[in-house]
């Protein structure tokens, strides 16, 4: 974990109408908190809610306020696909001492990864996930076969050194 010796880390959450924007984010947060409580119980997780409908100016104000209030935070995790919100803010404000871990290989996240404002991205092979869903539906509906309700998928940890070698469309 990038925050091994820190006392406090930031958890950025995308919210819509005051609630976490997706079930996926909710599940990731639950797993993250469980992991942290078992392995790093003394690390305080400080949340920052970012409304999905906010403007870039609004994001900047929220982030400036957050980092002014929490000057010792050096690590951030985002559980949605918008790590670039923090990454772009760090570039604009020339903050080079904060690491961000995010999800999803979207182009803006990849740009921030290449520039060094995002440290890591977890990529999840969306094409493979989609293929496996359709395959399971076919087996269940057409072939009348029982399908496993759990489908574990590989992930990849992307850094600026390997991001250009990631093949997102590979099955």
Regions found by a protein language model. Name each.
Residues 1, 115-127:
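Short beta-strand elements at the ligand-binding edges of bilobed clamshell
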